[in-house]
Amino acid sequence: MFFVAIAACAFVQTQPVFAQTAPQVPPNAGRLLQELRPPVAPPPEVTIPPILAPAEPKPVAPAGSGDARVNVTGFDFTGNSAISSDELRKALAAWTGRALSFGDLIEAVEAVEARYKQAGYFLAQGVLPPQKIKDGVIEIGISEGRLGETRLEGESRVSSDVVFGYLDRLPKGQALTLPVLERQVLLINELAGGRASLDLQAGEEAGSTDVVLAQQPEELISGRLELSNYGSPSTGGNRISLNLNANSAFHLGERITASVMTTDTQGLASYGLRGELPVGSEGWRITAAATGTDYSLGGAFANLLASGFVNTLRAGVGYPLIRSRASNLKLLLEADTNKLVDKYKSTNTQIDKRIRGLTLTVSADALDEFFGGGSTRADLALRSGNLTFDLTDPGAFNADQLPAGPRTAGGFSKATLIAQRQQTVTRELSLQGFINLQATNKNLDSSEKLTLGGPATLPGYANGEASGDEGVLVKLAVRWQAMAEFAVSVFADYGRVQLAHSPASTTVKNYRRLSDAGVSADWVIGKGFTASAIAAWAGQEPPNPADNDRPRFWVSLGYGW
């Protein structure tokens, strides 16, 4: 199968017209950095099954009780501490002051259990002990579901001390709530190097429940190899990339990722190293990354003798405010520094810039049962930064500050909102929606703009067909999951960008509007092999240069392990 993938990619290499034609404006380091950024994460999927309380036998009516009824004037409770007796009596108002049968009393007990579950105490159970009814008061015994022991079974690459650090945050000997348990199990499953499934078992002490985690180790090394025609003719239309992950090599739940990518013409190459380390047992994570990108332009821009590079250092810290199966709310604060250099030997020109920035990202996602169920994700990023030029050669800075120049130097701020929705229609059919909005307070460098065109945004257009300081991108799709291994989608996209926040001229059009429509297909081929294909037709504005009388094709083949 791997050789089939190689052969298919070789076919792509013989068909460069299917990939894209070069835009009129030559790409620079900033725009190529945009081109290499990974696509936005999709809406969430459930990562663990629902956590359910162990099944308990239903109570049986005493022999000879028949249709006997008792006049109930009130209820008393034993064993409750998490919820007061007064609160529980309010939950049983409908059963008070009535003549109740045994079945009615069981319903009252179930109402008490429902009140506990509403508060998150999913292990709570109510019982009807032998009664000595006085003045019509019924006694209900409550087992609130105290946590007994926590145990690990199986093996993981993650140290048991690290895993127990998360389990030790559970309130041993106290009533256990579903949100607390669910959060810790999900956080454990985010650790690189292992997976864990939960089993709840009756504890040795009456009314207690033991938490047992069955662990399975992940491979030390995982990765993905991908071949695609996602590139640009000026730097190489066909790409090959490799990502390698070291999963918990130090048994701390950390992940270290090394990545490399190059094109068939070697006009573009990128390489990077990224690390992610959990800190403590509350969900804190620190990240650090170093990446580099080198390019040289060919094709229609070969006469420019242009080349350059981007070097990026990034560090961040993240924390999940809410972590559950149904909804999540996370914060991520990142600081970065980017050095961008563009060289043009044809004019003996060099542009040397540095951008330092700080970004706060708030991410929220949720699963719901609305009209058959669906998932929603939203990411709001607030970024503030500063662009400086290397003033050892002031020519680039002076050109930037001309009245007709881009005027990007100095401080800037921008806000980006990305929202997605996946709506289930039937088991096989779903609707997908996506919107990306960006606003800023000044003219931005090409690396900070909203860019349209390419397989991730508007596949009917070439990479970097249009970019602007502010704008909107809307994507709609209907997806049909024909079988577990194959899905096909029909989509339409629309994008509009304002080229400059503060244009140098008011007589020149300061925006571009693009639209496209097409069809895509995704395959899972055997174990680890994937393939995707996109055919898209440009719509509202023709591509630059125009060739909108035929579709643009994008193909990707991958193997993960």
Where are these regions (language model features)?
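Periplasmic polypeptide-binding modules associated with outer-membrane biogenesis and secretion
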Residues: 20-231, 261-269, 415, 434-437
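Repeated loop/turn-to-beta-strand initiation elements of outer-membrane beta-barrel proteins
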Residues: 196, 221-223, 250-256, 281-287, ...
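Residues that define the transmembrane beta-barrel architecture of outer-membrane proteins
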Residues: 207, 236-240, 267-271, 309-313, ...
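Transmembrane beta-strand segments that form the barrel wall of outer-membrane beta-barrel proteins
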Residues: 221-231, 242, 253-264, 271-273, ...
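Membrane-embedded beta-strand positions of outer-membrane beta-barrel proteins
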Residues: 223-225, 244, 256-260, 286-290, ...
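Outer-membrane beta-barrel proteins
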Residues: 231, 245-250, 274-281, 316-324, ...
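Transmembrane beta-strand segments of outer-membrane beta-barrel domains in Gram-negative
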Residues: 278, 285-432, 436-438, 442
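C-terminal transmembrane beta-barrel domains of outer membrane proteins
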Residues: 398-561
